Amino acid sequence: MNNSQISTVTQFVLLGFPGPWKIQIIFFSMILLVYIFTLTGNMAIICAVRWDHRLHTPMYVLLANFSFLEIWYVTCTVPNMLVNFFSKTKTISFSGCFTQFHFFFSLGTTECFFLCVMAYDRYLAICHPLHYPSIMTGQLCGILVSLCWLIGFLGHSISIFFIFQLPFCGPNIIDHFLCDVDPLMALSSAPTHIIGHVFHSVSSLFINLTMVYILGSYTLVLRTVLQVPSSAGWQKAISTCGSHLVVVSLFYGAIMLMYVSPTPGNSVAMHKLITLIYSVVTPVLNPLIYSLRNKDMKYALHHVFCGMRIIQRS
């Protein structure tokens, strides 16, 4: 395989969401609003944790790092998606496509491990409250955050490297709104079944391990909370775990359909919808579920926005 073969295709065409212009305008407006809300919600959480010293605890430090991750996760795909609505060519460069591909999967893998760490934090806080301060120290929190980023970006690095080396000498049209693994490898002029198998095997390993751990952690949390001899126990269980599990189920359900047990019979439109759920919908729900429903966080956000108003008036 020589370099001339690899560089034959210099750009790809992302078809995105073809359809009547009016429908595309509506779709563009919805995605833009969701993107703005995602950025605003997650940036507000980061500012609140940064400026309110009462939130300088492992739980909120994890939330701030998770919000930082979500900002980059949506930003690596949504801006290009929005530009493509008004682009006549809808092209993305070869290097741009693989850069997006690399960051999309690396950040997605990082999110899986972040959800694990956050589940572990909730497990310690609720099931072992007396030992929580001595176990979940600032040092351990920093180590766990670093490991999430490290594993997330190294986990698929070998597979992505070999996919990047594939020759692309023929068609360059991707019927998707981002550079996803299966549509991308389908355009290669070389056999891809081994690389595809390795990529999906690694994805399945990460997804299944983290999902089982998260479900196990929340099961133990539910069991502990429900042992409280009052109706408040049920309410606390639902408040603590129910909403978290809704987002986790939505995220993991979508990525499992795509990368653990993909169904060849699914239409392209269905693949786009599933990808849209875990790449755009869940990031906008996370600020609401994990932070904005929290009393301490809402109090801190109130002071942050009040401070911004005072600065603007002055």
Swiss-Prot record:
GO terms for cellular component: plasma membrane. InterPro entries: GPCR_Rhodpsn, GPCR_Rhodpsn_7TM, Olfact_rcpt, Olfactory_GPCR1. Glycans are attached at N2. Keywords: Cell membrane, Disulfide bond, G-protein coupled receptor, Glycoprotein, Membrane, Olfaction, Receptor, Sensory transduction, Transducer, Transmembrane, Transmembrane helix. It holds the Pfam family 7tm_4. Disulfide bonds join C97-C179. It is found in: Cell membrane. It comes from the Eukaryota. It is a multi-pass membrane protein. Residues 46-57, 119-142, 223-244, 293-314 are cytoplasmic. Belongs to the G-protein coupled receptor 1 family. PANTHER family: G-PROTEIN COUPLED RECEPTOR, OLFACTORY RECEPTOR 11H7. This is Olfactory receptor 11H7. It comes from Homo sapiens (Human).
